[in-house]
């Protein structure tokens, strides 16, 4: 996979792309990153990339020309049609399901804006997706783009080294992850649940399902709305609700 970032602040990406999972993914050849300062594509003699909004108003608006030229140049060098993603608080909320969808693409181009906003023609004629990482406003799109790149990259084959890790993460199953424990079995009097020490894999699996459902019900009940539960999951959920009513 190729992931390109179009930004006015390329230095923001240095630490993120050269650390942890993203660094390992590049070393394993699973992904390549490219950070491009789209100011370099500006035809303005002063390399301006923004201008005042027509009709008046506060702030500056990103001009279409530099971003169109940058995307078109990156697309020329691509063997497949890229997903061009605009980081924007008005966009679709980014979810694990969206990450899984994007992980199937060969090439992503993430547009990171600053200033008041984008010329509407960028939205209408250049991008394929508009994404937001939450209902709040950031100074620019760079942090959101980093979040998306991390979330997508860890889903690529061989990146985590243990495929089960990605499959059992919170949200990957549509539920929050069950509690995890490691040694020691007793820390300051706080003990690991006996079932996890039993070696009985069937009981452990059932406990994990129950805890995952319980945690989801308590913290993110919206994830259960409209979810098609298995017979075992429904039985466990009914039991959890009865216990909570006592």
From Swiss-Prot:
Matching InterPro entries: Alpha/beta_knot_MTases (IPR029028), tRNA_m1G_MeTrfase_C_sf (IPR023148), tRNA_m1G_MeTrfase_TrmD (IPR002649), tRNA_m1G_MTases_N (IPR029026), tRNA_MeTrfase_TRMD/TRM10 (IPR016009)
Instruction: Tell me where in or outside the cell this protein is found.
Output: Cytoplasm
**EC class of the enzyme, as a word:** transferase
GO biological-process terms attached to the record:
tRNA N1-guanine methylation
Q: Which reaction does it catalyse?
A: guanosine(37) in tRNA + S-adenosyl-L-methionine = N(1)-methylguanosine(37) in tRNA + S-adenosyl-L-homocysteine + H(+)
SUPFAM superfamilies xref list? alpha/beta knot
The protein's Enzyme Commission number: 2.1.1.228
Q: Which residues bind S-adenosyl-L-methionine?
A: 113, 133-138
Molecular function per GO: tRNA (guanine(37)-N1)-methyltransferase activity
Keyword Kinase in record: no
Please tell me whether the keyword Transferase is annotated for this protein.
Answer: yes
Domain of life the protein comes from: Bacteria
Q: Which UniProt keywords apply?
A: Cytoplasm, Methyltransferase, S-adenosyl-L-methionine, Transferase, tRNA processing
GO cellular component terms listed in the entry, alphabetical order? cytosol
Q: What assembly does the database describe for this protein?
A: Homodimer.
Q: Please describe what this protein does.
A: Specifically methylates guanosine-37 in various tRNAs.
- Say which family it is in: Belongs to the RNA methyltransferase TrmD family.
The protein here is known as: tRNA (guanine-N(1)-)-methyltransferase
